[in-house]
């Protein structure tokens, strides 16, 4: 039985971890995940999906704010793991930790060397890519730059958003890891170096990127909305108040960027730099998420054709 240390945080990671837990060839000695966070207006403490799964299986849990130089690092190294598996962990691993195990493998949600970094799924959708994928790769000190063990891809559908693609890639990543790891560990599967000259990056989404730019084309705005749903969520402004936009669809019509060009009891169409979009699901500041018809029956009823949002 191969003894593993698992490192990851979101549901993507938990899906991969569950696959390892269900496989009798591996024993998970411990998991390292991000600290619990206070979320929402009530500041409720939320544990990570990886921690929740570890609790259910009685696995030791380590949650350092920063792994390097921490007491947890010493404790982790004393576990005596054969190898490390990471998936969306969100921290660099200290060299001393990498050197302490026989192998360290990362499950990365992009077709490397494209989209190294923390938000590959967001950028794949926002950039209008036709496919996304997962790469199983060796871990080195440089971010997502290690040799590639295996790859798998899937189409990005017009109906996909970050949430749906996240779920698809988690399953692909889980299966790809379990399929490739035995051959990798036996030496049968030889890793392939990345072409570093082709590397692109997907840094974590900044608050400024969440704001919609209505001068973009309708397709670009549409991709941007999908590439922010369900987190961190794209937004615009209406009368100085933030209006989050979860869902929209391409629509007919032209106008000035951000201009209301159609308004009925159940629809609101906004012009982009080229083309237009019909808003479907929004969330006004301080209100719950709602269908556009409910918004137009309330806060949005003052909007008229010719008015502007995003100003």
From Swiss-Prot:
What domain of life is recorded for the organism? Bacteria
To which species is this protein native?
Streptococcus pyogenes serotype M28 (strain MGAS6180)
**What family name appears in the similarity comment?**
Belongs to the Fmt family.
> Which keywords label this protein?
Protein biosynthesis, Transferase
EC number(s) on record?
Answer: 2.1.2.9
Q: Identify which top EC class this enzyme belongs to.
A: transferase
The reaction(s) annotated as catalysed by this protein in its Swiss-Prot or TrEMBL entry are: L-methionyl-tRNA(fMet) + (6R)-10-formyltetrahydrofolate = N-formyl-L-methionyl-tRNA(fMet) + (6S)-5,6,7,8-tetrahydrofolate + H(+)
Against Gene3D superfamilies, the record matches this protein to:
Formyl transferase, C-terminal domain, Formyl transferase, N-terminal domain
Q: Where does (6S)-5,6,7,8-tetrahydrofolate bind?
A: 110-113
State any single GO MF term: methionyl-tRNA formyltransferase activity
Write down what this protein is called: Methionyl-tRNA formyltransferase
For this protein, the record's CDD domains field holds: FMT_core_Met-tRNA-FMT_N, Met_tRNA_FMT_C
* Function noted in UniProt: Attaches a formyl group to the free amino group of methionyl-tRNA(fMet). The formyl group appears to play a dual role in the initiator identity of N-formylmethionyl-tRNA by promoting its recognition by IF2 and preventing the misappropriation of this tRNA by the elongation apparatus.
- List the GO cellular component terms: cytosol
């Amino acid at each position: 039985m191969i003894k593993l240390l698992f490192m990851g945080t979101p549901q993507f990671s938990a899906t991969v971890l569950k696959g390892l837990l269900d496989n009798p060839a591996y024993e998970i000695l411990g998991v390292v995940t991000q600290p619990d966070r206070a979320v929402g207006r009530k500041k409720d403490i939320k544990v990570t999906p990886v921690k929740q799964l570890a609790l259910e299986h009685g696995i030791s849990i380590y949650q350092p704010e920063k792994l390097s130089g921490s007491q947890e690092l010493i404790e982790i190294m004393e576990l005596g793991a054969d190898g490390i598996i990471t998936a969306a962990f969100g921290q660099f691993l200290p060299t001393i930790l990498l050197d302490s195990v026989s192998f360290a493998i990362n499950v990365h949600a992009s077709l490397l060397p494209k989209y190294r970094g923390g938000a590959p799924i967001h950028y794949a959708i926002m950039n209008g890519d036709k496919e996304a994928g997962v790469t199983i790769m060796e871990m080195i000190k440089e971010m997502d730059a290690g040799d590639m063990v295996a790859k798998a891809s899937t189409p990005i559908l017009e109906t996909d958003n970050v949430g749906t693609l996240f779920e698809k890639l988690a399953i692909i990543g889980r299966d790809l890891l379990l399929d490739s790891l035995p051959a990798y560990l036996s030496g049968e599967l030889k890793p392939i170096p990345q072409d570093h000259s082709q590397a692109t990056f997907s840094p974590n989404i900044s608050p400024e990127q969440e704001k919609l730019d209505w001068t973009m084309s309708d397709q670009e705005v549409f991709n941007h909305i999908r590439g922010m749903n369900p987190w961190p969520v794209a937004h615009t402004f209406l009368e100085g108040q933030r209006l989050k936009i979860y869902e929209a669809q391409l629509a007919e019509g032209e106008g000035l960027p951000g201009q209301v060009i159609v308004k009925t009891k159940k629809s609101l169409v906004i012009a982009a730099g080229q083309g237009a979009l019909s808003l479907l699901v929004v969330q006004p500041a301080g209100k719950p998420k709602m269908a556009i018809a409910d918004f137009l029956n309330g806060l949005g009823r003052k909007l008229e054709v010719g008015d502007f949002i995003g100003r």
